[in-house]
């Protein structure tokens, strides 16, 4: 038992089963860089307060830099007996510079605030990485939007043909979803920008420390004002997990449509061979595995969010060992999100838009019906419900003839309320550009939407 850094109170040795069960080193060694960063900031603060001597600080920093180098070069020996990355680094530091100086590093600090600080630094870094990837994905969508303002396709409600739109308008809908994802991450990052370092176990310390200094060194905006909240808070992790879950809600919807649109039934897009796979038995198959995997991984990141919510539910203040389970799911979600956004962006850059197939699909499902109803209201002063009924009859007549309403030669033969001007409406491009409301599918509106998004990402 005397090998453990907390063993002074114990007379008996820990069971080997407990040592293995209690250890988190295999998971939290991911935080080695943040742990060393936090320790250097803490030691620097201790020296500024007269708690450490200058030569002790220099030795600690030099020793920690050696530990970092050993880990990065794969020379560091991880031992599960060290329990976690924090103890592993501290033990190795004491081996390098001696326990007389190495043992002073943990003055005015608990593993509780140390862990919270390391974890929060990782979360902040992850926010910034995800913001960059989302920005790049929006830029790819904008490139498609600029090219395809006149590429007409059907929109859908209930997966039934609805109204004609442009591919530009369609892809911009997803770009605006990602814009909200960015804003959500920015808000979460702002809430996470408070340092718990110096909170100690839960009640602060009797040393005259300077928490603001260590927070400043680590790049935090301020300190957590309550030490008990500082060590027990995991909102920052929940916020990131939620933000990632919403990102996957959006990307899984896009991926589902890419799967549908690349199928033989639609053939709206062609996914590059570089991002498709084949079948082990069917030679003709070209499978959209990237999209299917992202769709599947959505359940995984949802699960990680629910897991941490459940872990934190009803935990008494302040720190509890349950909270050791907070990291694995978050590490997994962050990696999953980064990998997915990178490959989704690469795939979208190379998709081929099949314009003719999209336009031909508009000739099914009577996409111009709403335009006709609006015309009757606007030009003939007919109440909308009556106009709806009249156009419904036009649709029924067209279906009886086995044609789409866009193929009708003379609307007045179906109902005399229609004149020659109404025939001008049976044109998909006219329908697209007849929309006058803000945020509509017209080219003028689409260009404004592109400007909004370009202005947004330029200011990131």
Curated annotation (Swiss-Prot):
UniProt xrefs under InterPro entries: Arg_succ_lyase_C, Argininosuccinate_lyase, Fumarase/histidase_N, Fumarate_lyase_CS, Fumarate_lyase_fam, Fumarate_lyase_N, L-Aspartase-like
GO MF, one example: argininosuccinate lyase activity
GO cellular component: cytosol
Protein origin, superkingdom: Bacteria
Record localization: Cytoplasm
Catalysed transformations (reactions): 2-(N(omega)-L-arginino)succinate = fumarate + L-arginine
A biological-process GO annotation: arginine biosynthetic process via ornithine
UniProt keyword Cytoplasm, yes or no: yes
Sorted UniProt keywords: Amino-acid biosynthesis, Arginine biosynthesis, Cytoplasm, Lyase
EC number: 4.3.2.1
Biochemical pathway: Amino-acid biosynthesis; L-arginine biosynthesis; L-arginine from L-ornithine and carbamoyl phosphate: step 3/3
Family of this protein: Belongs to the lyase 1 family. Argininosuccinate lyase subfamily.
Protein name: Argininosuccinate lyase
């Amino acid at each position: 038992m005397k090998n453990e850094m907390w063993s002074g109170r114990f007379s008996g040795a820990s069971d080997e089963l407990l040592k293995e069960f209690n250890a988190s080193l295999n998971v939290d060694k991911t935080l080695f860089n943040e742990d060393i960063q936090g320790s250097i900031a803490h030691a620097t603060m201790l020296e500024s307060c007269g708690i450490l001597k200058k030569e002790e600080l220099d030795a600690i920093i030099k020793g920690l830099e050696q530990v970092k180098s050993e880990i990065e070069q794969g020379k560091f020996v991880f031992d599960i007996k060290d329990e976690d990355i924090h103890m592993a680094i501290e033990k190795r530091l004491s081996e390098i510079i001696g326990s007389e100086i190495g043992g002073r590093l943990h003055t005015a600090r608990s593993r509780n605030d140390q862990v919270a600080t390391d974890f929060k630094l990782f979360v902040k870094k992850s926010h910034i990485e995800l913001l960059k990837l989302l920005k790049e994905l929006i830029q790819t969508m904008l490139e498609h939007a600029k090219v395809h303002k006149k590429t007409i396709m059907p929109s859908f409600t209930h997966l039934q043909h609805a109204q004609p739109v442009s591919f530009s308008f369609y892809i911009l809908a997803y770009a605006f979803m990602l814009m909200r994802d960015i804003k959500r991450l920015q808000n979460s990052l702002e809430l996470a920008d408070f340092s718990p370092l110096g909170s100690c176990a839960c009640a602060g310390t009797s040393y005259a420390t300077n928490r603001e200094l260590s927070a400043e060194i680590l790049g935090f905006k301020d300190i957590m004002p309550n030490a008990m909240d500082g060590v027990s808070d995991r909102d920052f992790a929940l916020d990131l997990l939620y933000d990632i879950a919403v990102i996957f809600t959006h990307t899984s919807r896009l991926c589902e449509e890419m799967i549908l649109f690349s199928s033989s039934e639609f053939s709206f897009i062609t996914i590059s061979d570089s991002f498709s796979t084949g079948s082990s038995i069917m030679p003709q198959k070209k499978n959209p595995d990237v999209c299917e995997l992202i769709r599947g991984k959505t359940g995984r990141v949802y699960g990680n969010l629910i897991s941490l919510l459940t872990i934190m539910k009803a935990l008494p203040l302040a720190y509890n060992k349950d909270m050791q389970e907070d990291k694995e799911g978050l590490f997994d979600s962050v990696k999953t999100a980064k990998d997915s956004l990178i490959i989704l962006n690469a795939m979208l850059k190379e998709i081929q838009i099949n314009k003719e197939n999209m336009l031909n699909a508009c000739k099914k499902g009577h996409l111009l019906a709403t335009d006709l109803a609006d015309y009757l209201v606007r030009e003939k002063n007919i109440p909308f419900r009556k106009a709806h009924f009249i156009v419904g009859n036009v649709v029924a007549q067209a279906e009886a003839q086995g044609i789409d309403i866009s193929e009708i030669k003379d609307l007045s033969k179906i109902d005399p309320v229609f004149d020659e001007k109404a025939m001008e409406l049976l044109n998909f491009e006219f329908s697209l550009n007849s929309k006058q409301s803000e945020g509509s599918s017209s080219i003028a509106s689409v260009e404004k939407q592109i400007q909004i998004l370009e202005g947004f990402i330029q200011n990131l």
